[in-house]
Regions:
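Single-stranded RNA-binding surfaces
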Residues: 1-156
């Protein structure tokens, strides 16, 4: 059996597993958060950390929503309140007792665009991908349910 990604898209969730020899070698889940790597958006610098090239921006998302992200590699002349185009380079990370904000970098001249979907990210690598209907049981057959249980309990 050839190595490939199996992909499902459901309501509010995308998931993909990389299978080879009937076994899951890796898994990815996307929950549709717009603030993830690849997003290019307008933002306002709301705080600049003194003496550094870092700060905090508020990104303008669809339908008037706004979210904050850390920003690094700010130009020296960027002052609080300035509007700039940024590209998200790291998604938010939830750790026990701590929420790390997404990270962005200035992206002058880039076209505004949403972050790529999980499917688009995989397809961009050139990897073989087979999209499945959500009614298929291929994920379960390859051990998806056990993998999710291991991730939730921390027991392998």
């Amino acid at each position: 059996m050839a190595s490939e990604f199996l992909y499902e898209s459901g309501i509010g969730e995308e998931r993909a597993i990389f299978v080879s020899g009937g076994r899951i070698l890796s898994a990815r889940i996307g929950w549709g958060d717009p603030l993830r790597p690849g997003l290019v958006s307008e933002a306002q610098l709301i705080k600049r950390h003194g003496g550094t090239r870092r700060g905090l921006v508020r990104l303008d998302l669809a339908e008037g929503a706004a979210r904050e992200a850390l920003i690094d590699q700010l130009p020296r002349e960027a002052t609080e309140g300035v509007r700039l185009t940024v590209r998200v380079t790291r998604a938010a990370i939830l750790e026990r007792g701590r929420h790390k904000l997404p990270v962005a970098r200035p992206a002058p001249g880039e076209t505004l665009r949403p972050a790529p979907t999980l499917r688009a990210e995989i397809e961009a690598t050139g990897a073989r991908l087979r999209a499945l209907p959500t009614t298929a049981n291929d994920f379960s057959r390859h051990g998806w349910d056990e993998l999710v249980e291991q991730a939730q309990t921390g027991e392998i």
